[in-house]
Amino acid sequence: EPTRLTAKPSIANLVLWKAIYEYDGHYYVDAVRVGTQRRWYPGARVAKLDLGRDFPGLQPDSVQARDVERFRWFSDGYLTVEEHAPRIGDLRYSFLPNEVDPMWGIELSLNDQDEHVAWWASRRTDGRIRRQFVRMVLGLDGVSLDADQATPP
């Protein structure tokens, strides 16, 4: 059973929602289109941020550790770490609601732990992302959730 579940509208509309649930140290992300032509868009799974595992050199009393805790509070704890960079992202917001690709976050510098973390924001919206987003908003693709059209995934 999930530890917690959150659903929120995706960017700039009320038809396509992002669903995030936490289970066993991971976040699972899916998109759901509501209203007519209800659809489910399976998403991704990502490990929940664990500072001890993901940043073992981070000193708990450092400025950066306090910055991470502040960011955790503002993001309601929905944090994940990028695989090949010292970045922590806010999982709640992404351009495609069924993907784990945060729009913003913070970047740590373990060599300068008494300096504040850096803020980053991604503005990547290539043609593929825009087309996929529009298709999802229009109810194309995905798995039907309407009883008369539902088929097992």
Per-range role (PLM):
Residues 14-153:
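Extracytosolic and intramembrane catalytic regions of membrane-associated proteins
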Residues 1-3:
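Alpha-helical transmembrane signal-anchor/signal-peptide segments
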